[in-house]
């Protein structure tokens, strides 16, 4: 069963641990079953994309935000 989280989509949070410590950003998605959040422009990874006739005929790399554990973020109050 998923727990109730105090951080919601659209909230501003600060990263308090990890490689992006000190950065602030907006929550794009909350994953309550995994206890993780996705924060805009934080923990960005390069993903390889295969060539596709419709979406991306050339293929290449795409920057994608990866989930961060809920314990590594703190909600910024007053914004």
From Swiss-Prot:
Gene behind the chain: rplX
Q: Which family does it belong to?
A: Belongs to the universal ribosomal protein uL24 family.
Its recorded name reads Large ribosomal subunit protein uL24
Lineage in the entry?
Bacteria, Pseudomonadati, Campylobacterota, Epsilonproteobacteria, Campylobacterales
UniProt entry keywords in alphabetical sequence:
Ribonucleoprotein, Ribosomal protein, RNA-binding, rRNA-binding
* A GO molecular-function annotation: structural constituent of ribosome
Q: How does it assemble?
A: Part of the 50S ribosomal subunit.
Q: Listed GO cellular component terms? A: ribonucleoprotein complex; ribosome
Role, per record? One of two assembly initiator proteins, it binds directly to the 5'-end of the 23S rRNA, where it nucleates assembly of the 50S subunit. One of the proteins that surrounds the polypeptide exit tunnel on the outside of the subunit.
Biological process according to GO: translation
UniProt xrefs under Pfam families:
KOW (PF00467), ribosomal_L24 (PF17136)
Query: In terms of domain of life, where is this protein from?
Result: Bacteria
């Amino acid at each position: 069963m998923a727990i109730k989280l105090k951080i919601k989509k659209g909230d501003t949070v600060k990263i308090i641990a990890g490689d992006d410590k000190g950065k602030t950003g907006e929550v794009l998605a909350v994953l309550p079953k995994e206890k993780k959040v996705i924060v805009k422009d934080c923990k960005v990874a390069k993903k390889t994309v295969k060539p596709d006739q419709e979406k991306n005929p050339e293929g290449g790399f795409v920057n994608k935000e990866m989930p961060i554990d809920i314990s590594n973020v703190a909600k910024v109050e007053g914004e």
